[in-house]
């Protein structure tokens, strides 16, 4: 194991177990020195020879166009000479990089293990997750980046005004393929730069960017993975992310990097080229798992995505959709919608973790997670309620039916659980179970005033919508296209 005082002299250094995989025993003394210089000086230098413990980002269709990359990184000084691919010097350089992914057996036949690289200027990279790909036979979940509306609503099939308003808002605001391309381009560039200090690290895109519930104005969630396993967030994550933040300050395409020391620490930053806001966490792989669980729910029934999008817009307008300010995160809101749709007398959606347990196994290798639900068929519900009726029913459920003081929302079980089952949950205002690690996703709501504001929004919006049947009375047109509010930095 690497002696911590040698490489990491920081007072708040990481736990020793974390970096034994970053710098293995077979790394030479010279390579350790290079890694140390990369992390303490200007983060510049050739990658050390370390085994690829975290395989290359594999969530890309097989058909990939090659992307040329300049030999100089974004911080390069342009003094390196250009070298032919077949030169002796280049062959020598390859011996000091991670093993080629082509020497590894494919983990999934539908995804390639080719890395995505980035040009220095302009960053015009073809988004690998948006390349053309066919649907897997029998599966309801489209390939990553698929732009067509599978089983989409026909505008003429929607009769009532409220449903039409919801559908119009959905089509106007849903994330487009070019939005995803911008996020993927920054992800690929960032992974290349982070590998200068953590050669075997991978950066994964997740959250609403991939789960089917993103809008054109959605931020992007990134997960930095160095080794898969439990992390001491107070020590390991904060330390690693502090190194990453120092790196981001030196990258010309990144603006305003800020370390947020939350229960799950993140680095917030902005991509100068696309203007997209990013949240980067460290080793929070449960976020990758729930991304593809939610993606399956998004496409298993055609009414789910429009309903979730309008509810997120509504919650943002009423200032109850910001965990950093003590209200509900977007993830919690999505789980609340799914729970409501699961627990209707005639469910609109199934309970995926109960019906397809092997597809969402919490122990599944993280690189197989995207293909887990690939063969799950579309759900045919007997409940044919309109979008308008479902939205009104959602507001009614949380305004008058759900018992906040006694019940826990569980999408994993497709029912409510009693708070008394868990002593840690008894004094929480809102309890929403995370489907994989079973923590409370609504833990940010810890002030009674914020809790009462959330309940009041449901009660008043339900009253108005029941009376008017018009979306504009609870979500004005001027706010429907607004970017989600975020806490000031």
Swiss-Prot record:
Region (Disordered) residue ranges read 93-118
Q: Annotated Gene Ontology MF terms?
A: ATP binding; metal ion binding; poly(A) RNA polymerase activity
GO CC term (a single one): cytoplasm
Kindly give the Pfam families that the UniProt entry links to this protein.
Answer: MTPAP-like_central, PAP_assoc
Q: Which residues form a coiled coil?
A: none
Enzyme class comes to transferase
- Entry EC number(s): 2.7.7.19
Q: Which keywords describe this protein according to UniProt?
A: ATP-binding, Cytoplasm, Magnesium, Manganese, Metal-binding, mRNA processing, Nucleotide-binding, Transferase
In this chain the PAP-associated domain maps to 386-440
The record's section on InterPro entries has: MTPAP-like_central, NT_sf, PAP_assoc
Cellular localisation: Cytoplasm
The cross-references to SUPFAM superfamilies, in alphabetical order and at most eight, read: Nucleotidyltransferase, PAP/OAS1 substrate-binding domain
GO terms for biological process, alphabetical = mRNA 3'-end processing; negative regulation of miRNA catabolic process; RNA 3'-end processing
Q: So where does Mg(2+) get bound?
A: 219, 221
- Cofactor(s) this protein cannot do without: Mg(2+); Mn(2+)
Renumbered to this chain, the Polar residues biased-composition regions fall at 100-116
Under CDD domains, the record lists: NT_PAP_TUTase (cd05402)
Q: What is its main location?
A: cytoplasm
Q: Which reaction is catalysed here?
A: RNA(n) + ATP = RNA(n)-3'-adenine ribonucleotide + diphosphate
Q: Please state which protein family the record places this protein in.
A: Belongs to the DNA polymerase type-B-like family. GLD2 subfamily.
Q: What does the UniProt function comment say about this protein?
A: Cytoplasmic poly(A) RNA polymerase that adds successive AMP monomers to the 3'-end of specific RNAs, forming a poly(A) tail. In contrast to the canonical nuclear poly(A) RNA polymerase, it only adds poly(A) to selected cytoplasmic mRNAs. May not play a role in replication-dependent histone mRNA degradation.
Q: What is this protein called?
A: Poly(A) RNA polymerase GLD2
Q: From which organism does this entry originate?
A: Danio rerio (Zebrafish)
